[in-house]
């Protein structure tokens, strides 16, 4: 019975993030992955992680481990920590797949992730650093395939 309540809690938390406009932070990675994907800050499933069980149109809206500092025209700086351009590896739940996109709103270069994990996005061709998909994802769609 515990497995069912964990799955329900994860789905409920993802729904709140998507539909309630409360997209502060994604749920942490579950010990047993049964839905969606888990994105990791570093290669080989290291660093901070987050469970993604529903589509996210803009990873910049989700608080995460990567910090971006911006300056306005008056020289004022601000920083924002998010998951935008931050994923370096992905674990996929059995029966699920995902597409990670270079730009928000599911646009730009796309990296399809099947039922096999990606241990290092530096080994996946893409438009970002050194022509790879490392630290490149800005939106993600997840799909149940069975």
Q: What is each model feature region?
A:
Residues 1-11:
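Bacterial N-terminal signal peptides that target proteins for export
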Residues 13-16:
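Alpha-helical transmembrane segments
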Residues 18-21:
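C-terminal motif of bacterial Sec signal peptides marking the signal peptidase cleavage site
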Residues 23-146:
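Compact beta-sheet-dominated domain cores in extracellular/mature segments
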